[in-house]
């Protein structure tokens, strides 16, 4: 029976414990253990952010060119990808890091052929360097990788938030939680699920989103087993 294909979008912030750390290897190892468990049932693709190492807000403070800043962000995701690959290798998980920019000594090219081979081998795919182009978000990258791998779901791991609300629950204690919303609702009400380009790509390719709190213990495993609170975004 063909395994269901899923993409998990993990922000760089999820990989750090506090402001003084860059990569928290306890968190990396915990994520790896969860991925190892679900890889027995799913073809798993991971899209990593790099915000634990480099953030666009820093570039603005330094009055840095946007192209350069975004390229630095892409390089940051490669570092994160190698750290996660190492943790998965220790668990004997068949893993490949696929990069949108050339870095042949460290990672493989994110090409259609390499993706096809990885799926055939049932490898966990770690996608790094975003789309390879500036001005595109990690959200857009997740949507593109989901389309390329023919994944049916993107798991959107949020830091400290259980899903989608009508306003920020950290600010508004009376914020309304949504169990299910449509792509059109997310766009028209600006519900901050992911950027508009990424939402449109998901809608066009029938890729559902599952928005959940990745900071909870065993969050990825539990949300796939429907044990945790989450929001579904679909047509």
UniProtKB/Swiss-Prot annotation:
Optimum pH is 6.8. Gene3D superfamilies: Acetylglutamate kinase-like. InterPro entries: AceGlu_kinase-like_sf, Asp/Glu/Uridylate_kinase, Uridylate_kinase, Uridylate_kinase_bac. GO terms for molecular function: ATP binding; UMP kinase activity. It is found in: Cytoplasm. Pathway: Pyrimidine metabolism; CTP biosynthesis via de novo pathway; UDP from UMP (UMPK route): step 1/1. It is an enzyme of class 2 (transferase). Its main location: cytoplasm. Unlike other bacteria, is not activated by GTP. UTP is a competitive inhibitor against UMP and a non-competitive inhibitor toward ATP. UMP binds at residues 50, 70, 131-138. Homohexamer; trimer of dimers. NCBIfam families: pyrH_bact. This is Uridylate kinase. It comes from Ureaplasma parvum serovar 3 (strain ATCC 700970). The gene is pyrH.
């Amino acid at each position: 029976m063909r395994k269901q294909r899923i993409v998990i979008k993990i922000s760089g912030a999820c990989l750090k414990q506090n402001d003084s750390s860059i990569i928290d290897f306890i968190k990396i190892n915990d994520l790896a253990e969860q991925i190892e468990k679900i890889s027995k049932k799913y073809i798993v693709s991971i899209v990593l952010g790099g915000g634990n190492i480099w953030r666009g807000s820093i570039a603005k403070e330094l009055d840095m060119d946007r192209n350069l800043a975004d390229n630095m962000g892409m390089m940051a995701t490669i570092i994160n990808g190698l750290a996660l690959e190492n943790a998965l290798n220790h668990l004997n998980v068949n893993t490949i890091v696929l990069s949108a920019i050339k870095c042949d000594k460290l990672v493989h090219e994110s090409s259609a052929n390499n993706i096809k081979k990885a799926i055939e081998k049932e490898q966990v795919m770690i996608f790094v360097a975003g789309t390879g182009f500036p001005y595109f978000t990690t959200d857009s990258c997740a949507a593109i990788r989901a389309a390329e791998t023919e994944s049916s779901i993107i798991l959107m791991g949020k830091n400290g938030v259980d899903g989608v609300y009508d306003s920020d629950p950290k600010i508004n204690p009376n914020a309304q939680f949504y169990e299910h919303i449509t792509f059109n609702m997310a766009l028209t009400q600006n519900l901050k699920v992911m950027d508009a380009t990424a939402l449109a790509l998901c809608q066009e390719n029938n890729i559902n989103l599952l928005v959940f709190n990745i900071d909870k213990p065993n969050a990825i495993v539990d949300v796939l087993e429907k044990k945790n609170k989450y929001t579904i975004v679909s047509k």
